[in-house]
C-alpha cells in the first residue's frame, strides 16, 4: 500500500497505526508517520469514553432538573449543586436567591415515564389514578388499557366500602394493590387470555402484566374525593383520550353550587360546561392551589425569603422594599393560585375569579371551586410533589 493511501486510511478510521520500523525515503516522511501515530493514539483514547458511555449520573439528572426550574446557566446550577452537596431543593433556592433568577420559570418539570391516567365519577365520590410503565408501546396495549379501566372500577368500589379521601403516591396508591381485581366490574373488554377472577388482587394482576410485557408496571399517583354535602358537584376531565375516562392527563374537580339539585334540573348543561372549561384551564395553567390561603405556609415563607434575599443589594427604604416584595408575591400568586391566574380559554385577560363571578351573574348561580387535582403523565409539579413541595 502506498504511503499516502495508508495516511488517508489512518486519518479517516483511526486505524491501523503506521509502522515506524520500516525504512522511509527521508526524515520528513518518518516525522509525518510519527506524528500520525501520536494523533491516532489520542483519538482512540478520546473516543473510548464515548463508545462506552455510562448512563447519565445522578448529578447530571439533578443539574437538568435545577436548570429546567430556574432557567439559570448550567455553570450557576452546577455551582449551586456542588455548594449544596447535591441537595436539589437547596440548590434551587440558592440559584433563585440571585436577583436574575428569583422568579420560577416553570413549576412543572418533565419526568421520563409513560403510562395512562384514568378518572371517573361514581355515586358520591370521584377517583383519579395514574398507572405507569416504561414505554409508550406498552401504555397503548389493550391489556394495559384494560388494567387501568378495571383498576378504576376497583378504586371506586374500594372507596365506597372504606370512605375517606386521599391524594398522593403513598399509602392510598399502595392500598389499591390489595383490592380484588375483577374485569367484569371494570367495563367491557375484548377477548384474549387473562387471569382475572374473583380471588385475584390488583397487585397479582400487575405482576402478571410485568411478566407479559417484561417492563415495570406500577401505580403512580392516586386521588379520591368523597362528596361532603349535597351542594358539591363532582367532575372529571380526561385529555388525549384513549377511551372514555382514560387518557394521558386528567383533572379531578369539585365545585360547590348553591341549591345544586334544583339547578341541575334547569341548568345542568351550563354547569357541566363551566366545570369542563375550568378543568381545561387547570390542565393548561397548572395551578398549585385554589386560593392564596390554600397555599402551604412553608411555600409562602420560602418564597418571601427568596425574594428578600434577591433584593438584598437594592439600596431602597424599607417601605419601598416591602412594596417590591409584595409586588413579586402578587406575580407569584398569579402563576400558581387558580383564582389569581389569567383565564386561558379567552383573550379577555380576566382573572379566573372574575370569570366565575361573571358566569354566576349571567346564569343566576353561586359557584365556588372547592378542590382540584391534576395528573399529567411525564410531568410533576414541584410545589405539590417535590422537591419544593416536600
Curated annotation (Swiss-Prot):
GO biological process terms held by the UniProt record? mitochondrial translational elongation
Q: Where in the cell is it found?
A: Mitochondrion
Record carries keyword Signal: no
UniProt cross-references to Pfam families, sorted A to Z: EF_TS
Q: Name one GO cellular component term.
A: mitochondrion
Q: Which domain of life is it from?
A: Eukaryota
Instruction: Print the keywords alphabetically.
Output: Elongation factor, Mitochondrion, Protein biosynthesis
List the Gene Ontology MF annotations in alphabetical order. translation elongation factor activity
The record's listing under InterPro entries reads: EF-Ts_dimer_sf, Transl_elong_EFTs/EF1B, Transl_elong_EFTs/EF1B_dimer, UBA-like_sf
Q: Which family does it belong to?
A: Belongs to the EF-Ts family.
* Other facts noted in the record for this chain: This protein may be expected to contain an N-terminal transit peptide but none has been predicted.
Query: What does the UniProt function comment say about this protein?
Result: Associates with the EF-Tu.GDP complex and induces the exchange of GDP to GTP. It remains bound to the aminoacyl-tRNA.EF-Tu.GTP complex up to the GTP hydrolysis stage on the ribosome.
The name under which this protein is listed is Elongation factor Ts, mitochondrial
Organism lineage string: Eukaryota, Sar, Alveolata, Apicomplexa, Aconoidasida
Amino acid at each position: 500500500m502506498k504511503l499516502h493511501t495508508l495516511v488517508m486510511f489512518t486519518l479517516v478510521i483511526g486505524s491501523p497505526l503506521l509502522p515506524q520500523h520500516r525504512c522511509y525515503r527521508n526524515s520528513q516522511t518518518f516525522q509525518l508517520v510519527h506524528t500520525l501515530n501520536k494523533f491516532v493514539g489520542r483519538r482512540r483514547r478520546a473516543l473510548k469514553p464515548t463508545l462506552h458511555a455510562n448512563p447519565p449520573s445522578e448529578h447530571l439528572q439533578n443539574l437538568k432538573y435545577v436548570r429546567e426550574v430556574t432557567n439559570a446557566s448550567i455553570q450557576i446550577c452546577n455551582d449551586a449543586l456542588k455548594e449544596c452537596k447535591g441537595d436539589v431543593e437547596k440548590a434551587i433556592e440558592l440559584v433563585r436567591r440571585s436577583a436574575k433568577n428569583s422568579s420560577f420559570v416553570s413549576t412543572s418539570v418533565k419526568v421520563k415515564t409513560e403510562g395512562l391516567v384514568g378518572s371517573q365519577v361514581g355515586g358520591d365520590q370521584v377517583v383519579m389514578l395514574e398507572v405507569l410503565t416504561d414505554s409508550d408501546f406498552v401504555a397503548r396495549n389493550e391489556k394495559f388499557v384494560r388494567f387501568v379501566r378495571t383498576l378504576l372500577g376497583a378504586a371506586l368500589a374500594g372507596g365506597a366500602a372504606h370512605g375517606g379521601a386521599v391524594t398522593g403516591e403513598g399509602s392510598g396508591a399502595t392500598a389499591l394493590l390489595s383490592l380484588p381485581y375483577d374485569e367484569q366490574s371494570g367495563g367491557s373488554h375484548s377477548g384474549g387470555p387473562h387471569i382475572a377472577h374473583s380471588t385475584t388482587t390488583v397487585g397479582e394482576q400487575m405482576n402478571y402484566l410485568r411478566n407479559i410485557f417484561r417492563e415495570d408496571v406500577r401505580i403512580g399517583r392516586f386521588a379520591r374525593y368523597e362528596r361532603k354535602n349535597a351542594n358539591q358537584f363532582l367532575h372529571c376531565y380526561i385529555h388525549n383520550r384513549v377511551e372514555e375516562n382514560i387518557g394521558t392527563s386528567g383533572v379531578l374537580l369539585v365545585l360547590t353550587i348553591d341549591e345544586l339539585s334544583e339547578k341541575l334540573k334547569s341548568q345542568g348543561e351550563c354547569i357541566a360546561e363551566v366545570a369542563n372549561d375550568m378543568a381545561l384551564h387547570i390542565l393548561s395553567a397548572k395551578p398549585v392551589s385554589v386560593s392564596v390561603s390554600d397555599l402551604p405556609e412553608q411555600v409562602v415563607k420560602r418564597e418571601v425569603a427568596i425574594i428578600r434575599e434577591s433584593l438584598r443589594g437594592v439600596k431602597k427604604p424599607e417601605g419601598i422594599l416591602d412594596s417590591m416584595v409584595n409586588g413579586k408575591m402578587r406575580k407569584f400568586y398569579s402563576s400558581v393560585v387558580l383564582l389569581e391566574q389569567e383565564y386561558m380559554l379567552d383573550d379577555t385577560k380576566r382573572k379566573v375569579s372574575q370569570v366565575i363571578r361573571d358566569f354566576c351573574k349571567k346564569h343566576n348561580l353561586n359557584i365556588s371551586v372547592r378542590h382540584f387535582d391534576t395528573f399529567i403523565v411525564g410531568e410533576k409539579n414541584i410545589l405539590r410533589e417535590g422537591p419544593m413541595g416536600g
